Amino acid sequence: MAIGGVLFDIDGVLVTSWKPIEGAAATLRTLSEQQIARSYLTNTTTRTRVQIADLLTAAGMAVSPDEVVTAAVLTADFVRDRYPDARCFLVNSGDISDDMPGIDIVASVDTRGGPMPDTPDVVLLGGAGPEYDHVTLSWVYDWMAQGVPVVAMHRSTSWTTTEGLRIDTGMYLLGMEEVSGRKATAVGKPAPEGFLASAARLGVEPDEMYIVGDDLNNDVLAGQVVGMTGVLVRTGKFRQATLDRWAADEFAMQPNHVIDSVADLPELLGL
């Protein structure tokens, strides 16, 4: 197939704790030399597009903010469309306000230690961190049980650091959905909107793109659902046991390609 562009997950594919994975910079240079468009789709909510691009560039990968699509950007688009002028309570680890222009954040976890805030119109859940404490999550659960819409920037249950795996928003969200009997809306991966938005930004059709990720479900298979060609890398959160269990199911969708790391991508693409 013609290569219209390549969509990369970031954490665990290009970097781990913002330290470059061996061969990542060389792969991006090869794609640039071959004039193959690139986009970067991440559920990272601790940093803005500008900060992410700066960190990748400092790690030897020339990336511009316009090439980065974050879960916060997608969430802001969703809220503006679905809940215009909503008063939003935000729980997130990191300041991402620059990626959410026009969103009315009436309260956030800066209110910890004070009384319970007024009931918001919408609750926004970003990435997990110290802000996900007992009191704050109790507020969110109370509002969720009352029927206040909860919009999660993603459903990721973990991410990879140089010190090992860390739990993420999805761990908490699953529990609150179970006990409240209500479902949150998740906007980031594996929802299709981010994959489609990334293709649209490059001006190509999804079936002309490759998606490269370390998460079998949230990255690779989710991209394949919208027509992209999936490439699973054996770095980051990849676990061989997970792939083996998946491969044993004859009815399950399988990744189109599996490679050791992003360093092997040029060879796979015939570059």
Task: Describe each region flagged by the PLM.
Residues 2-10, 15-19, 26-36, 45-69, ...:
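Asp-based, Mg2+/Mn2+-dependent phosphohydrolase catalytic module
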